[in-house]
């Protein structure tokens, strides 16, 4: 398989890109130890990652990422006050409160390596993990969990929900954040099993 032949070069390129991103402060700090562990394993390398986030986003319509604007973004638990401050910045389009679980893309040397990683990730609670793509250049595993939240808060400067409701969704979001951060810790503690 060509992706196996190209593995060493792809890993070298990915590690160089990660080093640049680390220097620029573009990598979520709490996921760095896990990335380093994965990258230290001979048959794997990370290509992109997010440790999970809570956000408030303004966009012309749902799904328009190109024209979307972050009003608040956190890779940690968030307070109601922080969310309210982000909401105050809303002017036009739709206003969304979003939770996204962690996502990691990992290159694997062989199909067997990819399957081992998917099985490990699923056993750690990342139920949506899968083999994302197979090409001549790379074999990519996507590690992803189930936590997600999409709540429309307002549109064109008008807010549809009250503070009591916002407080409840912030509580739920923080609960999801704690849950997926625990899954990341579990994965980090078990990732060395791939060395066997």
Swiss-Prot record:
The keyword S-adenosyl-L-methionine applies. PANTHER family: TRNA WYBUTOSINE-SYNTHESIZING PROTEIN 3 (PTHR48418:SF1). GO terms for biological process: tRNA methylation; wybutosine biosynthetic process. The lineage of its organism: Archaea, Methanobacteriati, Methanobacteriota, Thermococci, Thermococcales. Keywords: Methyltransferase, S-adenosyl-L-methionine, Transferase, tRNA processing. The gene is taw3-1. InterPro entries: Taw3 (IPR022908), tRNA_yW-synthesising (IPR003827), tRNA_yW-synthesising-like_sf (IPR036602). Pfam families: TYW3. Its EC number is 2.1.1.282. It catalyses: 4-demethyl-7-[(3S)-3-amino-3-carboxypropyl]wyosine(37) in tRNA(Phe) + S-adenosyl-L-methionine = 7-[(3S)-3-amino-3-carboxypropyl]wyosine(37) in tRNA(Phe) + S-adenosyl-L-homocysteine + H(+). It is an enzyme of class 2 (transferase). One of its GO terms (molecular function) is tRNA methyltransferase activity. Belongs to the TYW3 family. This is tRNA(Phe) 7-((3-amino-3-carboxypropyl)-4-demethylwyosine(37)-N(4))-methyltransferase 1. S-adenosyl-L-methionine-dependent methyltransferase that acts as a component of the wyosine derivatives biosynthesis pathway. The keyword S-adenosyl-L-methionine applies. It comes from the Archaea.
